[in-house]
Design a protein with these regions (language model features):
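Membrane engagement elements in two modes
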Residues: 25-33, 37, 64, 71, ...
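Alpha-helix termination/capping residues and helix-transition junctions
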Residues: 12, 75-78, 116
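Intrinsically disordered, low-complexity boundary segments flanking structured domains
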Residues: 35-39, 69-74, 110, 137-142
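Local sequence-structure signature of Cys/Sec-based thiol-disulfide redox active-site neighborhoods
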Residues: 40-88
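Intrinsically disordered, low-complexity segments enriched in glycine/proline and serine/threonine
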Residues: 5-6, 55, 266
């Protein structure tokens, strides 16, 4: 996987790059739409939603985006709306000898690919382009109204002795033929690390959630296709970094194509 390292900009320039959303702007809160789409066996398959939050430890408005994600997950259910915080770009922080950094080279690659111009910024099921955080609630509502074309199940087998996890991603076609890429990521919750706050202060004990750690497979996934009624299993192995807390690590798997994310699933490794 090609890794691209980007030079971090100065703090002053970074601050001016962070999007500033007026607090007076209100979220659009809506009822949950129906998302049921039974397969041939009568099993109800729900299309889940992926929020890719392009964030950074030096972004003063990014904690606001984290709060909005929490509200969305409270409204729709954290099992139905899966968030991944991709620390990246000029406002991302790769760390020092004394301070924990959460930005990754792969995250920077995604940041550049999507042409992110401000942070916080996000993708909701990769439909509708780059959105500021005040637009996420409506985008989630719109995405939730669509039917699932496949189901995804994740089976994780973690070995404490060598800190490796065997990941089985099981997919089943529900309707039509789905072609695209199967992407598998590792994320971690409850990481305590520095974060710039909306009031300009620095919180050294900020708790970061759903932090993108690495791509288990290629940065852009593996080629994937599935027909209605077809079942497939893809198996991967990941060795955890020594600094990761296994109890807080989850696997996120999703299938995407030119029409966006078709299905997504998340499961903790322990």
């Amino acid at each position: 996987m090609k890794k691209i390292i980007y030079i971090l900009m100065g703090v002053a320039m970074a601050m001016t790059s962070c999007s500033d959303i007026d607090e007076s702007e209100r979220l659009l809160n809506v009822d949950k739409p129906g998302t049921e789409n039974p397969d041939d066996d009568g099993q109800v398959v729900t299309r889940k939603i992926l929020i890719e939050d392009f964030t950074g430890q030096k972004c003063v408005n990014c904690p606001k985006a984290a709060d909005i994600i929490e509200q969305i997950q409270n409204d729709y259910g954290a099992d139905n709306v899966i968030a991944v915080g991709i620390h990246s770009g000029a406002l991302g922080f790769h760390g020092t000898a004394k301070l924990v950094g959460l930005a990754t080279d792969t995250g920077d690659e995604y940041y550049q690919h999507w042409g992110i111009k401000f942070q916080p910024a996000g993708l909701v099921n990769r439909v509708g382009g780059i959105l500021n955080h005040e637009q996420w609630m409506k985008a989630v509502h719109d995405a939730a109204g669509q039917k699932a074309s496949l189901s995804i199940e994740i089976g994780n087998n973690y070995n404490d002795a060598d800190r490796t996890v065997t990941i089985n991603v099981r997919t089943k076609g529900v309707s039509g033929n789905t072609e695209g890429k199967l992407q598998v990521w590792a994320i971690e919750d409850n990481i305590v690390a520095m974060q710039k706050m909306p009031d300009g202060s620095t919180n050294k004990e900020y708790v970061h959630k759903h932090v993108f750690r690495t791509s288990v497979n290629d940065a852009w996934g593996d080629n994937f296709s599935i027909a209605k009624g077809e079942e497939k299993t893809a198996t991967y192995t990941l060795k955890l970094d020594g600094k990761w807390v296994a109890e807080n690590v989850s696997i996120v798997a999703f299938v995407y194509n030119g029409d966006g994310v078709q299905q997504v699933e998340k499961k903790s490794i322990k």
